Amino acid sequence: MPRQEHIRNFSIIAHIDHGKSTLADRILEVTGLVSDREKRDQYLDRMELERERGITIKAQSVRIPYTAKDGRKYVLNLIDTPGHVDFNYEVSRSLAACEGALLVVDASQGVEAQTLANVYLALDHNLEVIPVLNKVDLPSADADRVKHEIEESIGLDCSDAVAVSAKTGLNVDKVLEAIVERLPAPEGNLNAPLKALIFDSWYDSYQGVVVLFRIVDGVLRKGDRIKLFATERSYEVIRLGVFSPEIVDMTELGAGEVGFLCANIKELGDAKVGDTITHVDRPAEVPVEGFKEVQPMVFCGLYPTDSADYEQLKYALEKLQLNDAAFSYEPETSQALGFGYRCGFLGLLHMEIIQERLEREFQVELIATAPSVIYKIDTVDGKKSDIDNPSKLPDPTKIAALYEPYVRMDIHVPNDYVGNVLKLCEEKRGIQKNMGYIASNRVVITYELPFAEIVFDFFDRLKSGTKGYASMDYEFIDYRQSALVKLDILINGEAVDALAVIVHRDKAYHYGRALALKLKRTIPRQMFEVAIQAAIGQKIIARESISALRKNVTAKCYGGDITRKRKLLEKQKEGKKRMKRMGNVELPQEAFLAALQVGDE
């Protein structure tokens, strides 16, 4: 067991694409952990999707033995964290397992919004932060400007920031020396009762749930009986070890160390991220603070395009939930789409990733309904309820008040595009709170916005309005009363539940009109006329018609009596009427996507 003063636990904080995973790769190579033969980009991102999108979704840990220049042998535990705002809770738990962090900033781009959010999380956990300027080999790199930006926006002293190029490996050895010299060693009591923090867990089909943890106090040995605070359940440790970066089995781990255990835990929900492990016979009195249940924020319906795939979808969702405790689902039926599931996600990226994994790993073709958020309702009879599906909203006469979630958003943008950003935020019912310069040409704008307005197309429009230069970060603040209405879409007088949305009263007419027009373009023409109507309650606010396809029934009449032609046309008209009464309109997949793309025009 290494001595505590020779252990360093750290994580790497960076905005997407600033070189976090590349720096981790170089550290593994410089310390000789990964040979040239095993080398591959983004070594710690095990999921194919993580490597393809260039993002880190799950937290990982790796134990790195390092001999410093003074000859001492150290154990460095790198805890790789996700960088995206959706996975904020995972980031906060990973940071709670560390004493220090490397703040990696792209020397050509400067400080971005999500970097700031994660740095503030690190400072909340009292971590020592070392600034690292990456990509200094690029011609566009401006290290002095970026140092100034970091000092201005975060207040970190950058006089001894390390300038590196993770791509070429330049100065990576200096980063390792800085970790050893400047980051504090863990403080834990080996003789105290066991207390260990779970910062990640995943499901393995052979060993059950694998738990990644950091020991705060005490010693954990193979064969010990342990219990978890949140569930009060007890287990026996069957396997104990560390990732270095492949699995190395251990017999014991002490305070300050990071490792994994297997204990025949059957469900991921039993080993929640942020929970505390302790011994059954000598339990700790209080858990590690900061544990909270993760609540889904965004909901949408997922339906198989072929109803025969329903069981396959169910199996796929069960498998995904084993590895993602923040993801929730429950069965639901839709008159338009048949049987499917209502799924809850942490945010938009999370939703995209789950959908992509379902299609890629399980080959399930999906129809996804428009995403919605959780609304709170006070009914006239004094009851309170939460609604995550617009089609479940009660009749407007029964609603006393409707509340929607608001978020506080920080947007970092070059000053050339400030006008576009302000226009977009105002259009999305935002309330401007603050605006200031963090550098001569970069502005940070703070807005409070309804979460429902971000869910649709906000991120895409922000990127296109700023040529990709803007970055954003948001956090949930509270629920506020709003003038919201449910907008129904009727096709030939029948409401299509999967197209119902909750919108602000001021936007209802414009949205209803745009959606009806979009549907007119996507629904194929039928043998009878199709009426598309947008309605609030009983009131129709917009209508579009798709004209019928018709055969030229008078083609066989050459000259002759007009009454003959009229008779044939009347007969056709009767047939169309009967068809309209009996006929069903098949809605293509594009019709449901139309609801997601209304704001694009």
Curated annotation (Swiss-Prot):
Q: Per UniProt, which keywords does this protein have?
A: Cell inner membrane, Cell membrane, GTP-binding, Hydrolase, Membrane, Nucleotide-binding, Protein biosynthesis
Would the keyword Protein biosynthesis turn up in this protein's UniProt record?
yes
What GO CC annotations are associated with the protein? plasma membrane
Q: List the membrane topology term(s).
A: Peripheral membrane protein
GO biological process terms, alphabetically, are: positive regulation of translation
Family assignment from sequence similarity:
Belongs to the TRAFAC class translation factor GTPase superfamily. Classic translation factor GTPase family. LepA subfamily.
Q: What name is this protein filed under?
A: Elongation factor 4
The gene that this protein is the product of is lepA
